[in-house]
């Protein structure tokens, strides 16, 4: 009886450690994905002197910024299908 209980405890410990590894790998994959998205070259629009002016040049963007006098589209709007 004691051997059965100890075996069950060992099996549960192994399953718990494997699930922790799976969670760690999944969170690492999310970090990689978000890093890849940040590396995408942003769209660039016309000249600007401040951020609000960029919405006129980049109407399809959710977030625009004026970077070094040029409008940069950071997140493009994609309509739902």
Swiss-Prot record:
Q: Which cysteines are joined by disulfide bonds?
A: 48-66, 54-71, 58-73
Q: Which UniProt keywords apply?
A: Antimicrobial, Disulfide bond, Fungicide, Plant defense, Secreted, Signal
Q: Which residues form the signal peptide?
A: 1-26
Q: Name one GO cellular component term.
A: extracellular region
Look up keyword Disulfide bond and say if it applies.
yes
Where in the cell is the protein located? Secreted
Q: Does the keyword Secreted apply?
A: yes
List this protein's GO terms for biological process. Answer: defense response to fungus; killing of cells of another organism
> Where is it mainly found?
secreted
Q: Which family does it belong to?
A: Belongs to the DEFL family.
* Protein name, UniProt field: Putative defensin-like protein 265
Tell me what organism the protein belongs to.
Answer: Arabidopsis thaliana
